[in-house]
């Protein structure tokens, strides 16, 4: 070790270099994720890992950003409150029966249990979000089974995809916040809510089309059909994640 490195100034310089390196890798990773779908996955699999942060790190950073935006905007995309489960979700009838039985078992009332559930589901939504990425990987195995890609390819692809999805949701929440600031209705408008959902799914489909072409080298026509199915899979996993959070939180809170 050089004498310069043992001084305070030398230590500070090393810290600055380290953080600059992290920042540059992060920005390079984000730029590649948003503008070159699939390129990060290909680079990782080809061993080009030093210029970028690892897939799990990128996913976790996107997760932190998303839930920070969700908290700032008081939105509940994943951390669905109990009242919404009981009245506004496709499984609301089933949820009403499950919640009623749980209240009896806990010897409590809906009014007392609701804040407990809402607090717990918000925490669970943050810590378990990786389950969505893991659930998507088997869909890739089925869709591209003839490509004989290792399981790790599908896992890395899924982590990058859901990092993109979380950033997409973060951007949507930011736009909604600006809209509300200037007097717009936000998600209170059913039309805007549905339009935004369609736009997000289209963006996801475009990403999948480009990314699967880069990673799996699929022909155009077949790729379109598979992307449609995979996009439906993304939407189904989001709904499935919300329902899973209901069950996990209901029987643990």
Enumerate the language-model features and the residues they cover.
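Membrane-proximal intrinsically disordered regions of secretory-pathway and membrane-system proteins
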Residues: 1-253
